[in-house]
Amino acid sequence: SLFQNCKASGMPVREIFLCDFLSGSTFRAKYKTTVDRYRAAGDEDKNRLKTSLPAVTVSGTFSKRNSAELIAHSGLICIDIDEKDNPDVAEFDRLNELISIIPYVAYCGHSIGGKGYFVIIPIASPEKHKEHFEALRQDFARCGITIDKSGKDVTRLRIYSYDDTAYINPSAATYERTATVRTIYTAA
């Protein structure tokens, strides 16, 4: 589902093919300049610029942006790998080259800030979205990479970005592994 911006929580603007959003010339022509300005901006301007960009729910189509309004899961999960969360990763700017070797990675490109990556992975059991996320978190952690916990949210928005060196694999393998999601309870 395509939403007007990252603050939108109501109805989507329309449905869209993910490939058009990621690499379509229409979005690039309309929003590339804004993304470039965002990447060069100071903190004050970034929030304003970010809310002027469209966003999609990679993991599904929704009548409204909440998990109860999921119409259909896309069979995809999107994870974020941020440089700030991975200070020990040598040559972070070349991480996409390593990620592209992973057979189940369908897409890897720079996030809007240009200092992190978002990775799209086909999953075997959409109804186990969080369990797939947990398994991916564990797999990447074993490689010394921390992924942002926001990927476990099926309603998570992906703000428009572009990457001239994005990795695209339309024949990516499906990620099968799941792991139990641990719930931590706190005393009341």
Model-derived segments and their meaning:
Residues Y107-G113, D148-D153:
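Short beta-strand
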Residues T51-L53, H73-L76, P103, G114, ...:
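Sequence-level motif detector for i,i+2 pairs with an aromatic at +2
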Residues V35-G42, I99-P103, L136-G144:
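Hydrophobic, Leu/Ile/Phe/Ala-enriched alpha-helical segments that form helix-helix packing faces
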Residues S1-G75, I184-A188:
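DNA replication initiation on ssDNA origins
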